[in-house]
Regions:
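N-terminal low-complexity, intrinsically disordered "leader/linker" segments enriched in small/polar
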Residues: 1-49
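Beta-sheet-rich sandwich/jelly-roll-like modules and their strand-loop junctions
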Residues: 29-107, 142, 148-211
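Solvent-exposed, conformationally flexible loop/turn segments
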Residues: 67, 124-128, 140
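Exposed aromatic-hydrophobic patches
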Residues: 127-135
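A short, structured loop/turn motif at beta-sheet edges
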Residues: 136-142
Length: 211
């Protein structure tokens, strides 16, 4: 029996690791891209999570265009059930409302059909605005959080300091987009959005609660 040298042993181990990574499903194994999980689960019951999780969030607010529906992606870190969508309204406006929603993705991870869209929620007073839902998410799949403000209330927001771009920038001097939007809406789309625009700068910080 031939005894392998230490260098040969290392080469065998390296080949094994490379073959293992090739045969793993890229849609379900996100561990290599993530910090270490703290606790038993990524999504702990009753806590709030948003598109930047588990990366840092810079606390700030922003105002957004009336009639514009915003879409921001996140990748499910584990199987879970979303029971609530939520956002913090920081500046109220009389007669202002919002819709909250979550959308599936297609085979290219682009925004697709809705899994839940809420009825109008009043933003005539500031504070937490939420909608109950029952949406199953699956580890490794991409989902799109969404909001449609009618009127001009302000919210906590995500921006370049906390969200990853969804694709590259168009020039060396421009920002990369963080999500999508559609304009001139009175209600949330009930199908995959068409004529969507890239969104730069900031997006409303829609959050979700799981069980």
């Amino acid at each position: 029996m031939q005894v392998k040298t230490p260098v040969q042993e290392i080469m065998v181990l390296r080949d094994f690791i490379n073959n293992l990574s090739v045969h793993q499903s890229p849609s379900s194994d996100v561990s290599a891209l993530l910090p270490r999980k703290i606790g038993e689960k990524w999504y702990q019951s009753g806590l709030r999570y948003s598109a930047e999780y588990p990366y840092p969030y810079t606390y700030s607010t922003g105002s957004f265009s009336s009639g514009t529906q915003y879409f921001m992606p996140f990748t499910a870190l584990e199987d879970a059930t979303i029971t609530t969508l939520e956002i913090q309204c920081t500046v109220a406006k009389a007669d202002a409302t919002i819709h909250l929603g979550i959308y599936a993705s297609d085979s290219n991870n682009d925004v697709a059909v809705p899994l839940f869209t809420s009825d109008p929620i009043s933003c005539s007073t500031s504070g937490i605005k939420n909608a109950s839902c029952n949406v199953q998410i699956v580890k490794g799949k991409v989902y799109w959080l969404s909001i449609l403000p009618i009127g001009t209330p302000a919210f906590l927001r995500n921006a370049q300091d906390s969200l990853f771009p969804i694709k590259g920038s168009t020039s060396a001097s421009s920002m990369a987009p963080l999500g999508y939007c559609t304009t001139n809406n009175t209600s949330m789309t009930q199908s995959a959005p068409t004529s969507k625009l890239d969104t730069y700068g900031s997006l409303p910080r829609v959050m979700f609660v799981t069980t």
